[in-house]
């Protein structure tokens, strides 16, 4: 018999053995995953919808095909393993389900999406076992990058880009006047908006960098080093990109870098930087591991799990996954029932010299989801004027939430208003008192100083993450999900002297009255049995 015949015979025998090991496990795990995706169809739909509408996350369409290709690339290694169901996967599904329910209760979409990925891991481990999951560790982990996340990085990246650009311009000898994310140079005015943050470049670079590192390097330190470079390089490059665009416009008397060429220069520069990064990274590529996944000798067959064993674990996994959405439906029915009673929020009574004023302080309004009840009321005390915005939410759902990424002081590229700065103020009313978020807005006619925070279950909360956790805990414990946004607004003229003292005085004088107005809404809900 020739060497070719021997090779064919060995390959045929290996394929037959692999099929014997996987003949029940493979269709079972595929079927279970399809059912899990069907159970979480709304979560799957939310992921795909974001891929479709956002260029930042459009690469998500490629993640699943890449994951399948990576698993296929490991088929020989997987073929010599014998799948064995594992209760660890079911335990992981319990944790993933609880995580999903918390995301549902808090209306945090990214938590539900991450929980779905964790559920996929749990199903794979429950049906195929830890050894098989270990062999698919990178493809399963890479699936996390299909989840559209990273927008939380936009504000700090915008701040970094503004800092870098201003310093670079000053280093170039150009005088700069900066106010928040806006800055002026002799040739014109500029602002750093979300599109300038570089988050799109960062996410794209990180995704490709992780894949490149796994395929190119065998040593862990090389992989980690390249992934770190794929994060650091685009952040620094984005600072240079913004600086170069401003310089091109400045040196061309604003003839260039203001229209579509603004984006062309940016993408060309980013593409060049990424090309250089991966070109340099290729010099340290490790040789591909040519060793056989089966070793030098024959691999003994481990006892195969019978069909009923795979079916039992698949049923347990599916039941565990389905339990959490069923409980969520129960909570949803309660929420719908409680939303039937209309709410009224009366203006807080004036106190300590502050009186209600019918003259509007400003035409500005926060860009918030429609509340269950709300008001915008102006108060005066001598020559001091402050407006109060209260928004009361209950039975919250998408499009009607207290805490949402859509809830902002102004939308990006607002035709009239600009956000020129935002910061945390600790102990706004004195040591040990509440913390507030301070925002400065400007328009051609007016400047506003705004303090805002959340009121949930009688507690003043500043962090949106803590607010989400509190709302989720209240909802899961059948205490409802009511909460309020509180904003105090004062006008001013001099950007160097914002009316901080006026807001502090107003809050000290009027908070008992504001608390009473919100407490009356809470009492009305309790009286109605909700």
For the regions a protein language model found, what residue spans apply to each?
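Hydrophobic N-terminal alpha-helices or hydrophobic patches in metabolic proteins across all domains
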Residues: 2-530
């Amino acid at each position: 018999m020739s060497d070719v015949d021997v090779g064919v015979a060995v390959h045929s025998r290996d394929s037959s053995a692999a099929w014997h090991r996987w003949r029940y496990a493979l269709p079972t795990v595929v079927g279970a995953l399809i059912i899990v995706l069907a159970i979480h169809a709304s979560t799957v739909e939310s992921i795909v919808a974001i891929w479709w509408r956002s260029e930042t996350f459009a690469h998500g369409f490629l993640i699943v095909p890449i994951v399948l290709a990576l698993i296929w690339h490991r088929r020989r290694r997987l073929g010599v393993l014998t799948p064995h169901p594992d209760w660890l996967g079911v335990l992981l599904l319990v944790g993933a389900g609880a995580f999903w329910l918390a995301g549902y209760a808090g209306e945090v979409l990214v938590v539900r999406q991450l929980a779905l990925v964790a559920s996929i891991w749990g199903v794979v481990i429950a049906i195929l076992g830890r050894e098989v999951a270990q062999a698919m560790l990178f493809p399963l982990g890479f699936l996390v990058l299909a989840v559209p996340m990273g927008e939380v990085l936009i504000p700090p990246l915008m701040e970094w880009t503004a800092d870098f650009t201003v310093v670079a311009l000053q280093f170039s000898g150009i005088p700069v006047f900066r106010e928040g994310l806006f800055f002026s140079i002799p040739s014109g005015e500029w602002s750093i908006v979300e599109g300038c943050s570089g988050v799109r470049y960062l996410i794209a670079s990180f995704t490709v960098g992780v894949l490149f590192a796994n395929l190119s390097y065998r040593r862990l330190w090389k992989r980690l080093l390249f992934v770190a470079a794929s994060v650091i390089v685009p952040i620094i490059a984005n600072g240079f990109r913004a600086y170069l665009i401003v310089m091109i416009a400045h040196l061309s008397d604003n003839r260039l870098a203001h229209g579509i060429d603004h984006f062309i220069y940016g993408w060309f520069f980013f593409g060049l930087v990424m090309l250089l990064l991966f070109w340099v990274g290729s010099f340290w590529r490790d040789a591909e591991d040519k060793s056989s996944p089966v070793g030098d000798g024959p691999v003994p067959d481990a006892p195969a799990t019978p069909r009923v064993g795979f079916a039992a674990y698949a049923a347990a996994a599916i039941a565990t996954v389905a339990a959490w959405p069923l409980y969520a439906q129960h909570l949803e029915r309660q929420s719908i029932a409680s939303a039937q009673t209309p709410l009224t929020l009366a203006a807080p009574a004036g106190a300590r010299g502050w009186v209600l004023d019918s003259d509007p302080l400003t035409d500005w309004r926060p860009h918030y989801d429609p509340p269950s009840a709300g008001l915008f009321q102006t108060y005066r005390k001598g020559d001091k004027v402050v407006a109060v915005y209260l928004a009361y939410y209950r039975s919250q759902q998408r499009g009607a939430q207290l805490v949402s990424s859509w809830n902002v002081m102004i939308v990006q590229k607002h035709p009239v208003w600009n956000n020129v700065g935002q910061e945390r103020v600790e102990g706004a009313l004195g040591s040990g008192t509440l913390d507030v978020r301070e925002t400065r807005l400007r328009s051609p006619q007016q400047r506003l100083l705004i303090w805002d925070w959340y009121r949930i279950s009688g507690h003043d909360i500043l962090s949106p993450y803590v607010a989400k956790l509190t709302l989720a805990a209240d909802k899961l414990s059948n205490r409802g999900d009511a909460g309020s946004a509180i904003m105090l607004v004062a006008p001013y003229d001099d950007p160097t002297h914002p009316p901080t003292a006026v807001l502090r005085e107003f809050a000290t004088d009027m908070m008992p009255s504001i608390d009473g107005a919100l407490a009356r809404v809470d009492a009305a809900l309790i009286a109605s049995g909700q």
